């Protein structure tokens, strides 16, 4: 499995903003992340976290924390058998001898991805102006693109995005992943596919409306840059 993260600071979220963020999280989980099979998302109040953070696998009977929407500490195995969210998504990890775990430098459990966050360390509120956002998953590209969507959304909400370095056994990476994606669009192919005639001028206008940066055109070919939040 993979992990990536970023920090957003100087953000002022209302209760409605948080509701929108959670709605987006669940919509991404259900659709793009394929019901958490490819990736999952977590939000954490930065003020409660001590760096560095660690993502690893642990014996489910040694995992114990109070999950979201619960009042009592539960082991990893109990979460899958008793907690509603654990029952719903437990099939993603219940065949493993060890479960994924995300902890801070003090040993505080932040979450058990892709199942559920800790109630104490993994629940944000309107009083939080600094938030850690992470994605974990088995499909790295989906995980990276999901993180980019969230970074763009939180930036649009007024937050300042800070990168987080991830240390893998094979090397280091910084997230989010905002590299430009250049693409070439051949209008002959567009016309053949859509069955309509379209001029370069009209095509550039429509692409701009869709959020693409049109860099130029050479005859019947248009050059665009794809924003990192466009995964289609």
What are these regions (language model features)?
Residues 1-232:
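RNA/tRNA-interacting regions in translation and RNA-turnover enzymes
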